């Protein structure tokens, strides 16, 4: 079990304040805990996950009292809550089964990000979304050939804060080839479906990735990657 904490804040002297502006100095406290549990010497069953909580002040210059009273001097001194404050969580979990001496693997995962989970440490992180996925991974020919079947579902706006809810489901196959005389090869074939009240989007995606290392001399080498996409 691991515990992690982080504090983000904007420097007041680097932000010019104007009445009616849209951007204000912010601060955020982030705490998370992740874990991993395995059963058996060969780790036949593995369970891992992480949960994180975020307390965010969207305007540190807001001097109004919060709508809730926590009656805690520690909270008042360190978190300094006000009417711009919010709290939300994010979590992920993965249940993994290692079968037939690890040659076959079944993975079932889930990722959840609350609508208010926004902070500078994870810029661009999609929020208000719940994702579930399942994968079957099969190793063949001494791990030189790997086949992966996958199914992914995703739903946003579970908080009903958005005007439109978009559902996505995806299924496909990955083929990985790892032979010493040939480039490392991955072929991915996916079917992606998006649907909401305004439109329905369906596409087939084929991706080819080639990776080859070249030894130029005893002390130097080169790596070449070729990636092609068709949809």
What are these model-predicted stretches?
Residues 3-7, 11, 23-231:
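Exposed, low-structure sequence patches enriched in small/polar residues
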Residues 14-15:
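Outer-membrane beta-barrel transmembrane domain signature
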Residues 20:
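Substrate-binding cleft/loops of secretory-pathway carbohydrate-active enzymes
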